[in-house]
Amino acid sequence: MAGIYIHIPFCKTRCIYCGFYSTTYNDIQSRYVDAVLKELELRSDYINEPIETIYLGGGTPSQLHFDLIEKLISNLTSSSDVARHCKEITIECNPDDVNDELAALFRRLGVNRISMGVQTFSDERLRFIRRRHTAEQAHKAVDTLRKAGIKNISIDLIFGFPDETMDEWIGDIDTAISLGVEHISAYSLMYEEGTPLFSMLERGEIKEIDEELSRRMYYALIDRLTASGYFQYEISNFAREGFRSRHNSSYWRAVPYIGLGAGAHSYDGHSRQWNIDNIYTYIYKVENGTIPYEREELDAVTRYNDMITTALRTREGIEIKEGGFYDYMMSSAKKLVSEGLLAVDNGHL
């Protein structure tokens, strides 16, 4: 099994572009953590292989009270089996939440990878998307984590803001490189229906950048990061040698995983499950011994297609093996290979 994903939906404020399930009601954090741990008990039969990674995402996991972070991670890692096999524990953070006490707590609990939502080093754009931190706080957060002994830091960047220029984006890339972090993820700004950002676009208050500029920004990202020693191992992800995200890499290889918490998703190799995305209903159901999720059984074609679309995002692509999947995949890919859009190389598509 790839690992455990725990969704922590709490946020102080909502960013205008975010489509993930989140809530600003922080008064029920303790009940929520207890519910997550109880869900893990209720689904113990789901975990039939060693856990290799643990990932706390959100929302904003760094918004949890310190004692609840400790309770959650300590319970997850209390088993000797997990302690022996788990190679990566990641927690997502906002730069403005990072201080000496929190960084020391992470180190003491065995958290060995931090993923920080920096997004941009422009204070103006940070205010536009309603991020709480400043560029200065992002720099300080990296320094604080380093002083605490955290050796694996990833930051997220966004490009393609309305009116953003190529020079401004290159400035963000170069600033990220100067921080010396081990991993950088970068995504084009998405206008998801239901978000305030999408509504602003519909009302004509902002404009998307044109597709050609977005393409040039993406290639500038690749060129500058690879020239600085980062390896692009997935469409949006770049890492120093030895610092790929183990947890996310397992997703792209279609390795089974379990998701805990409101709105979390799971995959067991044959079906997808997703928890209800209402925190109050989630807590109530779990407290009463019910797992509040829906399930979709996947036929072979759906599994194959899912595997193809995720694996083709990666540098290695899909490992080619003889068998039913091979026949299906190669028959589907034949035309694209002949047109030069896909390639077969060293046992991979």
Residue positions per predicted region:
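Pocket-edge structural micro-motifs
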Residues: 8, 262, 346
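Immediate flanking context of iron-sulfur cluster ligation sites
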Residues: 1-8
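Conserved active-site loop/cleft motifs that coordinate metal ions or position small ligands
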Residues: 5, 321, 341-343
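Local cysteine-cluster metal-coordination motifs and their immediate loop/turn environment
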Residues: 9-20
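C-terminal scaffold of the Radical SAM
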Residues: 1, 22-43, 49-326
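A short, conserved structural fragment
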Residues: 337-347
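Short, Lys/Arg-rich nucleic-acid/phosphate-binding segment
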Residues: 238, 346-349
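Short amphipathic alpha-helical interaction segments
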Residues: 324-338
